[in-house]
Amino acid sequence: MRSILLIVFFMNLGISQDKYPTDTLLRSPTSNIFEKATILPISAWQRLSYNSNLLSCQFYPSCSNYGGLAISEHGPFIGLAITADRIVRCSPFALEYHYDMNGKFHYPDYRLIDPLQITNTKNNSNKSPLFAAGLSMILPGSGRIYAGRFMDGFMGMWMIAISGTAAYSSFQENKTIKGNLFSVITLIFYSGEIYGAYRTAKYYQIPNDNSDLN
């Protein structure tokens, strides 16, 4: 019975309409099988988040749509790193950081506009994106802290610490499958910290003039 329910569920993912935005990526002829396999769990998540106000995302586009676009445009490996960066930034501190850099808001729901591709590349700070990325390669989270976002850096460290500890504990208990799963999650967030440090230093800086993030 459980197998039948799973089959029906995944069939529904394939034939559903555009209520769930990532479904369009699943049906897109430009997305390969690996990208679609990675986007599939995001599409499943949207069936929960889009039907519960408690799971509403503060960003526009939402983290699930952002992740789906990242995977579709950059492939599953880089796309997952980009998604991990967004997940780390989607914290209680996001609104204050958004105000600091004169970020724009999406109306009428006033979500924080944070596009995948940022067109305004003007950087008024003296922070080096490459140096920030290098710091996070050595100590995850430190690159974001260097770039001026201490709490984002702390959140990144925390995510890696949690998943890394879970992986280590699983291997200690000879739970290989669980250990491998958490190892992959740790690697994804580690990659996300490197990308996130670079992106933070390059784009998410407090402006010295009236320029906005587009």
Please annotate each region the language model reported.
Residues 3-13:
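Sec-dependent N-terminal signal peptides
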Residues 24-214:
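Hydrophobic alpha-helical membrane segments
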